[in-house]
Amino acid sequence: MGMSEKASDTGMKGKKKDKNERNEKILNLTLEMIYLLTGEGYVIPKKKKSGDDMAPPQSCTDCILEGGCRCHVTNLTGGRALHAPGSVIQKENNKNDKKILELVSNIIQLLTGEEWEYIKRKKALYMEGIKEDPQQLSQWCEYEDKSIVMCNLEATACLNNDPRNDTVFCEHRDLSKFDTSLAEQSLPAIGIKGEPVSCEGANQSDCNINPLAEQIQGTDTPTPIMGCSLNNSLSDNYISNGIKTEATSCEAGNQSDYGNNPVAEVQLTDTTTPVKRCSLNSILSDNYIKIAIKEEPPSWEDENQTHCSINAPGEQNEEIDTPTSIMRFCLNSSLLDSSLLNAIKDDTLSCEGENYSDCSFNPLTEQTSPGCKQFTCSECGKTYTRLYNLKIHLKSHTDDKTFSCSECEECFTDHTDLVIHRRLHLTLKAFPCAECGKCFTNCTNLRAHSKTHTGEKPYSCTECGKTFRDRSHLNIHKKRHTGEKPYTCSECGKCFAYRSNLMVHVRIHTGEKPFSCSKCGKCFTDHANLIVHERMH
């Protein structure tokens, strides 16, 4: 234990010494750069030696407190004396610039050299990390020889990654023919949660993962499914398409083509063996976020895999037919919106002699379900989807107004209308007049009313000088001077300057007399005539 501790202490001291030397070099280079930039130097004072230490002058308080000042700092240029502060130095720009660049490069080497020396010693471990993260490869190649870092062309190409245990299944392939565009393309935003796939006794000839050509942000990484290819045709504004696929077992079957092929068409490697694949083609509408599709695990045992696909309408995908009969079945999954898909048609497979029956399903092709009840009014034939709405409508035929206002006694057929009416009474009391107590619905009307108490008439006619409290009254008055009469009676053709006068005139033709005297019962067409009549009583 004693020897090991002593060795560790020696190693720590050595590291500390190296670090101090490096810091001293950086400091020396920095001060030399300052000298080249400013042209100011420092005088080296002669210090008295007491043993091995050099003491600063006792007259300088800065040296006593801090251990050194500007005038007594030891020069870092080999001990030669420099010019005193404030002296004029001839500047040689070209030489100084070159020296400054050299000093900067030396400082950078001192700061970064330690990391790259450590990486060189741990080269084997770092190479494994580069294989997992290809982005580090380009950074490494900027500093080191590419022949050292580049992967061996005889290395193995990964065919499948198991997300659960991070196990990598690889086979020997020539990486010189490997698709290098995969590193340049971004992974698609298609989240596929895949279970482990086992392939026993199967011929694996090709496995390609071809992501989308355009960059779509996503978090999940697609996992290749052995024996199945997932073709997702996405529209413009998709974020993610979550598909949870259960385990697929392939035993004693020929698997020649399997991969993940999104919208970007990338040619797969041609093979001589017959292609038998299970492709999932989803064409989605615009602006939808997620579609959750859970697919049960099909199994292939001692049989050839039949051609199966899930094709949404809108795009024809060329598939390879097989002699095995194709059964159509329905993927009945709850979708997010009625306008999401008009139809989903699925070409599925027969596994182990079991055939699925034919049943097609078009989710929510109509806005209203055909089995929805329709409530029809017996009076007018109007239909409603809710019985409550029909009952309210029937009251309009019977004039049944059971809901009445407690303040004005106005009646309504629906309680909702009564609630809305009561709010009017509340708003009428919102702006009361301080002089007479009259209430108004808004502040503008209250301000106009207050002018009646103050007698203010700010609007005057330029023709006759008559004043008015409101601008609208002034505009009506101006029509007398211009002689404008825009309102014409349709019966006799008589014209009027005011709409109110036209309405009174029309009552002469219709015989309507809505204003009646409460004492004698006499009726009048105009309210002004009624007021004149009431003065007689």
From Swiss-Prot:
It comes from the Eukaryota. InterPro entries: Znf_C2H2_sf, Znf_C2H2_type. It comes from Xenopus laevis (African clawed frog). PROSITE patterns: ZINC_FINGER_C2H2_1, ZINC_FINGER_C2H2_2. It holds the Pfam family zf-C2H2. This is Oocyte zinc finger protein XlCOF29. GO terms for cellular component: nucleus. Keywords: DNA-binding, Metal-binding, Nucleus, Repeat, Transcription, Transcription regulation, Zinc, Zinc-finger. Belongs to the krueppel C2H2-type zinc-finger protein family. GO terms for biological process: regulation of transcription by RNA polymerase II. The keyword Cell inner membrane does not apply. A zinc finger (C2H2-type) spans 375-397, 403-425, 431-453, 459-481, 487-509, 515-537. Residues 1-21 are annotated as: Disordered.
